[in-house]
Amino acid sequence: MEVKIAKTAGFCWGVRRTVDKVMEVADHASGPVVTLGPIIHNPQAVARFREKGVGTVDAVGEVGDGTTVVVRTHGAVKEELDRAEGRGLEVVDGTCPYVKYPQAIAQRLSAEGYHVVIVGDANHAEIKGVISYSEGPCTVVKPGGPIPEIPAKKVAVIAQTTCIGADFEAVVGALALRHKEVRAVNTICNDTEERQADARSLAREVDAVVVVGGKNSANTRHLAEICREIQPRTWHVETEAELRPEWFTGCQVVGLSAGASTPDWVVEGVAGWLRGLHRPGTP
């Protein structure tokens, strides 16, 4: 089976930066090391960190004194960071710089009197963190979902960094018809836009697509959605253990894409399985 791997498959720059920080801290810390929430949305990578002795907590109140707290790639709620600093805990900030951008925009524009609208998933750690930096009310709009009435003349629209561009534009356009002043700041990260464009191109060239990454990874789910719109034979898996030979009946070429939090070794595991797949009717 021929396998075409997307150029952008695997760790993005921001995730690799955070992973390297965690490994460095784990190697040199004199006390316990924990991440504030899963460091990235990939169960296989989190398991590797656990093997290195790095734990995961949901709140600073769960850790003891002398613990080093690493902030996850998606950032953290400001109040939790304040609690950690108030206790004198060592905090290593692993927040992706692209995530810090919407945090700063929300803080600045809310201070200027704008009602901040965020296009994304209200339950995602990144969005919870961004909201905590706003100095005024925020409204989160789910992509494709209804847009509530917002009692404000000035509205600022930002996006979850992994948002699909068309979803962001749709919300901006709808709000522009309702409000006198709408300020839109595209906070979708460059890697996300490149990765999504790469996935679209790949899906047009192959007989099936496999997207690899955590089922809890927003950017991976979006890649699968994008590919499926073009190539209906698209599957989202976490590892090669989920693959089934019958999915690829009649396929000559399979495309392989992966989310920004998918480790290289997981991508290679899936690629190896696909390359070794025997197609009926071939020697």
From Swiss-Prot:
<feature type="binding site">
    <location>
        <position position="261"/>
    </location>
    <ligand>
        <name>dimethylallyl diphosphate</name>
    </ligand>
</feature>
<dbReference type="InterPro" id="IPR003451">
    <property type="entry name" value="LytB/IspH"/>
</dbReference>
<feature type="binding site">
    <location>
        <position position="41"/>
    </location>
    <ligand>
        <name>isopentenyl diphosphate</name>
    </ligand>
</feature>
<comment type="pathway">
    <text>Isoprenoid biosynthesis; isopentenyl diphosphate biosynthesis via DXP pathway; isopentenyl diphosphate from 1-deoxy-D-xylulose 5-phosphate: step 6/6.</text>
</comment>
<keyword id="KW-0004">4Fe-4S</keyword>
<feature type="binding site">
    <location>
        <position position="74"/>
    </location>
    <ligand>
        <name>isopentenyl diphosphate</name>
    </ligand>
</feature>
<feature type="binding site">
    <location>
        <position position="74"/>
    </location>
    <ligand>
        <name>(2E)-4-hydroxy-3-methylbut-2-enyl diphosphate</name>
    </ligand>
</feature>
<feature type="binding site">
    <location>
        <position position="74"/>
    </location>
    <ligand>
        <name>dimethylallyl diphosphate</name>
    </ligand>
</feature>
<feature type="binding site">
    <location>
        <position position="124"/>
    </location>
    <ligand>
        <name>dimethylallyl diphosphate</name>
    </ligand>
</feature>
<feature type="binding site">
    <location>
        <position position="161"/>
    </location>
    <ligand>
        <name>(2E)-4-hydroxy-3-methylbut-2-enyl diphosphate</name>
    </ligand>
</feature>
<feature type="binding site">
    <location>
        <position position="12"/>
    </location>
    <ligand>
        <name>[4Fe-4S] cluster</name>
    </ligand>
</feature>
<comment type="similarity">
    <text>Belongs to the IspH family.</text>
</comment>
<dbReference type="GO" id="GO:0019288">
    <property type="term" value="P:isopentenyl diphosphate biosynthetic process, methylerythritol 4-phosphate pathway"/>
</dbReference>
<dbReference type="Pfam" id="PF02401">
    <property type="entry name" value="LYTB"/>
</dbReference>
<comment type="function">
    <text>Catalyzes the conversion of 1-hydroxy-2-methyl-2-(E)-butenyl 4-diphosphate (HMBPP) into a mixture of isopentenyl diphosphate (IPP) and dimethylallyl diphosphate (DMAPP). Acts in the terminal step of the DOXP/MEP pathway for isoprenoid precursor biosynthesis.</text>
</comment>
<feature type="active site" description="Proton donor">
    <location>
        <position position="126"/>
    </location>
</feature>
<feature type="binding site">
    <location>
        <position position="217"/>
    </location>
    <ligand>
        <name>(2E)-4-hydroxy-3-methylbut-2-enyl diphosphate</name>
    </ligand>
</feature>
<dbReference type="GO" id="GO:0051539">
    <property type="term" value="F:4 iron, 4 sulfur cluster binding"/>
</dbReference>
<keyword id="KW-0411">Iron-sulfur</keyword>
<feature type="binding site">
    <location>
        <position position="261"/>
    </location>
    <ligand>
        <name>(2E)-4-hydroxy-3-methylbut-2-enyl diphosphate</name>
    </ligand>
</feature>
<dbReference type="GO" id="GO:0016114">
    <property type="term" value="P:terpenoid biosynthetic process"/>
</dbReference>
<feature type="binding site">
    <location>
        <position position="124"/>
    </location>
    <ligand>
        <name>(2E)-4-hydroxy-3-methylbut-2-enyl diphosphate</name>
    </ligand>
</feature>
<comment type="pathway">
    <text>Isoprenoid biosynthesis; dimethylallyl diphosphate biosynthesis; dimethylallyl diphosphate from (2E)-4-hydroxy-3-methylbutenyl diphosphate: step 1/1.</text>
</comment>
<feature type="binding site">
    <location>
        <position position="219"/>
    </location>
    <ligand>
        <name>(2E)-4-hydroxy-3-methylbut-2-enyl diphosphate</name>
    </ligand>
</feature>
<keyword id="KW-0408">Iron</keyword>
<feature type="binding site">
    <location>
        <position position="217"/>
    </location>
    <ligand>
        <name>isopentenyl diphosphate</name>
    </ligand>
</feature>
<feature type="binding site">
    <location>
        <position position="124"/>
    </location>
    <ligand>
        <name>isopentenyl diphosphate</name>
    </ligand>
</feature>
<feature type="binding site">
    <location>
        <position position="219"/>
    </location>
    <ligand>
        <name>dimethylallyl diphosphate</name>
    </ligand>
</feature>
<keyword id="KW-0414">Isoprene biosynthesis</keyword>
<feature type="binding site">
    <location>
        <position position="219"/>
    </location>
    <ligand>
        <name>isopentenyl diphosphate</name>
    </ligand>
</feature>
<feature type="binding site">
    <location>
        <position position="41"/>
    </location>
    <ligand>
        <name>(2E)-4-hydroxy-3-methylbut-2-enyl diphosphate</name>
    </ligand>
</feature>
<protein>
    <recommendedName>
        <fullName>4-hydroxy-3-methylbut-2-enyl diphosphate reductase</fullName>
        <ecNumber>1.17.7.4</ecNumber>
    </recommendedName>
</protein>
<feature type="binding site">
    <location>
        <position position="41"/>
    </location>
    <ligand>
        <name>dimethylallyl diphosphate</name>
    </ligand>
</feature>
<dbReference type="GO" id="GO:0046872">
    <property type="term" value="F:metal ion binding"/>
</dbReference>
<feature type="binding site">
    <location>
        <position position="261"/>
    </location>
    <ligand>
        <name>isopentenyl diphosphate</name>
    </ligand>
</feature>
<dbReference type="GO" id="GO:0050992">
    <property type="term" value="P:dimethylallyl diphosphate biosynthetic process"/>
</dbReference>
<keyword id="KW-0479">Metal-binding</keyword>
<keyword id="KW-0560">Oxidoreductase</keyword>
<feature type="binding site">
    <location>
        <position position="217"/>
    </location>
    <ligand>
        <name>dimethylallyl diphosphate</name>
    </ligand>
</feature>
<dbReference type="GO" id="GO:0051745">
    <property type="term" value="F:4-hydroxy-3-methylbut-2-enyl diphosphate reductase activity"/>
</dbReference>
<feature type="binding site">
    <location>
        <position position="96"/>
    </location>
    <ligand>
        <name>[4Fe-4S] cluster</name>
    </ligand>
</feature>
<feature type="binding site">
    <location>
        <position position="189"/>
    </location>
    <ligand>
        <name>[4Fe-4S] cluster</name>
    </ligand>
</feature>
